[in-house]
Each structure stands twice: as structure tokens, then as C-alpha cells.
């Protein structure tokens, strides 16, 4: 019965596709200078076209939500809509761009997401079995390991801003619990070695901090 069952996909018309693209909001998740235009593929490295990517990235560099329609209008004389959509799709596939909810949707879920995230960060002080934080921006869950969650607490509650301070903060939590870092499959026993490894991880956390902030995980 064709009134109940339809064979194959019911595809959107080009006008519907364009309309839905225009309504979508997007947000860059990495600092502008950290986004490279080299793409690793099965066939080797591919250089992305700077004449398309650079103007889009410049508009997204503030790490704030932007409607695709806004980007399209701003780039009307430089980037065609189909090329803009391709740029956004590639950045999203590289996890450098998020599809975000509108402001009303974010406000509706923000308090619950933040309460959940605070519970998880507090739990991370003694237990690292759940590596998940919720983003009010996207409405989704993002994998965040135990140590980044611990660093988040040091950054938020203690205003620790450099890798050495964050490493000391994490070590003061891990050491009394008898927990040690590992390097090359070996458990590190010396305090200096543990702190050295924690500093490396803290530096990686600070590099990721703009992403966490854009997703409202911190």
C-alpha cells in the first residue's frame, strides 16, 4: 500500500536543503590558529583550498555560534553556498566545528547540563570510570577523561592557569590515593617523573581549553 509504505528515501528538494542549512547554527571548537588546512586521507595528505576555508574560519574565529545564513550573506562575493556547506561539513567531520542549538534551547538545558558536569567533575576526584560531560551548546555528550576533568576543577575553582600549577593540583589528588602515572607501559614511582608526565597532560588540556569553553563544558 503506497499510502502506508514508500520505497526508498524521500529526499529533500534543493530549496528545502538550502533552507535547513540556513537555519543551522555552527561554532568553531578550536582556536583559529590551530586549524590547519591539511587533511589526512587514505591516499595521503590533501591540501584544502585556502580561498574557501580562510574566509569561513576568519568569521568563526570568535568561537561563538553563527547561523549558516549569516555566514552565507557575509561571504556572498567570495564563497558560493555549496562551497560553504562543503567547508562546514569537512570541519565538522574533523571535530573542529559543532552544530549548536539556538539560544533558547541552550538556556533550557544549561542548568541541568552544568549540574551533571559538576557532579562528574567532583566524582573524577576519586573515580575515573565515567569519561563524559554534557554540552548545552550541542545537546550532546563529549568524551572527557578523568585528568582533564580534574584539571577543569583546578582551573575553575582554584583559578590555576598554567601547566605546572595544574600538575601539582592533580598530583595532590592522585598521590594520597596511591595512584601513579604511566609512561611507555611502565608505572612511574618517582614524584618528579609523575609531575613531569602530569605537566605534559596539563599542557594538552590548556590547548584543548578553547574547545571545552566553546562547548560550555567548563
Task: Name the predicted role of every residue range.
Residues 1-61, 65-218:
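Rossmann-like AdoMet/SAM-dependent catalytic core
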